[in-house]
């Protein structure tokens, strides 16, 4: 989907900071747990991440200064199965892990939310996703007993017992030519299918907007696909027009 049906030009459309969360920590999480680099030619990196840096700068932040002040000691890189990324820093004397990723994954690892707060956050995610926005969640964790240097070693267990910070919603507009391309495929008897790592609600909104999903069509997530037998998948194949939250192995199975 990204860059083929959409422009791959992400922009931050909205933010939500948990009222009890320090605003500066939310901002730091968005730009420190981030692999964007800045050159004379502009931003280099994944558009989802460069949009966070652009927003931070637009809001008055100094990206180079903040990266120099709070260097990254260690990281747990993003992968499509875990759907999280974490980085480790010394924030004014405090050893802090920042984590960003998919809300549905990150929310289950947080410990500082009431049931009402969880419901409100999930409702906001539903609202943004239904508008075709990509939602990123951010959290932090104070770490005890880990050396504050590049000799620090992180493992996946650190991505538990997190403190939720907030959400950012990004828009990746559809390419103008996508609408006609999808229509032309249908006129030629070709059934277009969208395959994406995005949340199912977000992807469905975009798929409907550009004409890929029609009445009666089905959207399936990667985990749902994993639970399907081959016969079950073949039986639903003609109705499935969207595969969301897919992993690389899911994509191989779909193509086969």
Where are these regions (language model features)?
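Conserved cytosolic headpiece of P-type ATPases
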Residues: 1-256
């Amino acid at each position: 989907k990204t860059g083929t049906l959409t422009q791959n030009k992400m922009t931050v459309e909205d933010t939500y900071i948990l009222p009890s969360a320090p605003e500066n920590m939310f901002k730091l999480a968005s730009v420190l747990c981030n692999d964007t680099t800045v050159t004379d030619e502009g931003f280099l990196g994944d558009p989802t991440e460069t949009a966070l840096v652009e927003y931070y700068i637009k809001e008055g932040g100094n990206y180079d200064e903040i990266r120099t002040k709070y260097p990254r000691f260690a990281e747990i890189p993003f992968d499509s199965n875990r759907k999280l990324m974490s980085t480790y820093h010394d924030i004014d004397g405090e050893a802090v892990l920042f984590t960003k990723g998919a809300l549905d994954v990150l929310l289950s690892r947080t410990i500082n939310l009431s049931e009402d707060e969880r419901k409100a956050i999930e409702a906001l995610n539903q609202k943004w996703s239904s508008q075709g926005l990509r939602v990123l969640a951010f959290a932090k964790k104070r770490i005890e007993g880990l050396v504050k240097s590049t000799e620090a070693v992180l493992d996946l267990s650190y991505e538990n017992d997190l403190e939720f910070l907030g959400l950012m919603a990004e828009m990746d507009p559809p390419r103008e030519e996508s609408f006609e391309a999808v229509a032309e495929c249908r006129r030629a008897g070709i059934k277009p299918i969208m395959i994406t790592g995005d949340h199912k609600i977000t992807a469905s909104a975009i798929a409907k907007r550009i004409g890929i999903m029609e009445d009666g069509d089905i959207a399936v997530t990667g985990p749902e696909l994993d639970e399907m037998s081959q016969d079950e998948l073949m039986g639903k194949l003609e109705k499935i027009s969207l595969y969301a939250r897919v992993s690389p192995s899911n994509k191989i199975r779909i193509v086969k």
